[in-house]
């Protein structure tokens, strides 16, 4: 038997239940099987004093079980990422609340915060949770005021209609009174349904939060899905960026190739963005066989890496290639993406890096022709729409969509 603690006056094996007030109530009357009727009785309110009861619980606290985040809402769709500035994070949360229930956004953010293991990032997300709590409080207060105003107007209209109905009912038959009652009930039900609809559609304007209306990075990651699907945060703990040029000479001709290397340590995993070469042929072939809707060989991969040297950048996780992007410069300020593929959880991260890299090279526009054929056609189109690309032309001859984005 466990020993009784100093602040527990009960004997070992028992705990003290706090005193409480029991509400009064009326016990219904009933008839016994013998035929005797027991009339109703009133049980008055009473105070139940503290008492010792058996401790049936196990010692210590139970395990903390958090619900799994679903796929109905991802904050990364609206540009939320913990490494973004506070203003951009708040703008993304407001945008998510404009298209979803603010309470759902708050719950999602709070759940991701509770999953967070790194104290620094958890502090950032805690600040955002407080921001969303204040946002939801304003939203709820404004909705309550609108509902009270709507109900008062509805009651005044209903009272005026009922008075006029009673004055007319003196000269009508019973059938007319019944039809009038049915009409009033329909009006009340319609007013209630309209009130519910207005509550669902009610949204809090952004300018109530003193946020500017321009721009905003929409390509940040959801803390659970940004880089890898099995990590619990998009925390950049270490950064190492190298930009260089490599000169290669052959048959008296020399060419200069760009080389890029950027590394991040995220949740113990080493995430690397770097220029690919022929040493990556096997890994590139594996991705091509998975995503390319045609046969691919190792010779073609090596030839493509050699021909387009310096224009193919990949993303690696612990030295495993998770995706790559092949691009070419088509003018002084335009760049075209010829091929882009990535495993689940790495596409947004790869594109975010590519856009940053293009900006560093003074490109102002990205062009891409998205194929409408193959098993991944819908996912491709949705992905580029989500990244902010606009459709300018549908090429029916080769079944491709021409999309562009200014950066």
From Swiss-Prot:
Where do the record's region annotations for Disordered lie?
A: 145-231
Q: Does the keyword Transferase apply?
A: yes
Q: Which InterPro entries match?
A: Acyl_CoA_acyltransferase, GNAT_dom
**Subcellular location, record wording:** Virion
Q: Which PROSITE patterns does the record associate with it?
A: GNAT
What is one cellular component GO term in this UniProt entry? Answer: virion component
Q: What is this protein called?
A: Uncharacterized N-acetyltransferase R584
Protein species of origin: Acanthamoeba polyphaga mimivirus
């Amino acid at each position: 038997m466990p020993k009784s603690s100093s602040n527990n006056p009960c004997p070992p094996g028992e705990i003290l239940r706090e005193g409480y007030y029991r509400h009064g109530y009326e016990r219904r009357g009933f008839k016994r099987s013998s035929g005797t009727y027991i009339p109703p009785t009133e049980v008055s309110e009473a105070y139940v004093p503290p008492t010792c009861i058996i401790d049936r619980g196990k010692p210590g606290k139970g395990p903390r079980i958090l619900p799994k985040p679903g796929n109905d809402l991802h904050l990364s769709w609206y540009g939320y990422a913990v490494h973004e500035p506070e203003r951009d994070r708040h703008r993304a949360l407001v945008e998510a609340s404009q298209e979803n229930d603010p309470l759902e956004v708050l719950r999602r953010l709070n759940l991701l915060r509770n999953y967070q293991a790194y104290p620094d990032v958890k502090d950032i997300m805690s600040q955002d949770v407080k921001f969303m709590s204040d946002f939801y409080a304003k939203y709820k207060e404004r909705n309550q005021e609108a509902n009270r105003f709507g109900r008062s107007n509805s009651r005044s209209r209903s009272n005026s209609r009922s008075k006029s109905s009673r004055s007319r009912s003196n000269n009508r038959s019973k059938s007319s009174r019944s039809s009038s009652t049915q009409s009033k009930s329909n009006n009340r039900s319609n007013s209630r349904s309209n009130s519910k609809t207005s509550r669902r559609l009610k949204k809090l304007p952004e300018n109530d939060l003193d946020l500017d209306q321009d721009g905003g990075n929409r390509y940040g990651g959801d803390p659970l899905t940004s880089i890898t699907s099995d990590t619990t945060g998009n925390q950049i703990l270490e950064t190492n960026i190298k930009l260089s040029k490599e000169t290669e000479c052959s048959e008296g001709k020399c060419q200069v190739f760009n080389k890029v290397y950027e590394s991040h340590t995220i949740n113990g995993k080493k995430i690397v963005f770097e220029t690919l070469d022929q040493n990556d042929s096997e890994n590139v072939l594996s991705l091509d066989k998975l995503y390319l809707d045609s046969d691919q060989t190792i010779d073609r991969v090596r030839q493509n890496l050699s021909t387009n040297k310096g224009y193919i950048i990949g993303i690696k996780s612990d030295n495993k290639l998770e995706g790559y992007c092949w691009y070419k410069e088509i003018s002084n300020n335009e760049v075209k993406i010829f091929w882009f593929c990535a495993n689940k959880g790495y596409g947004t991260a790869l594109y975010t890096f590519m856009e940053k890299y293009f900006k560093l090279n003074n490109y102002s526009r990205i062009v891409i022709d998205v194929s409408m054929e193959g098993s991944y056609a819908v996912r491709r189109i949705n992905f580029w729409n989500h990244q902010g690309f606009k459709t300018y032309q549908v090429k029916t001859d080769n079944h491709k969509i021409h999309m562009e984005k200014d950066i």
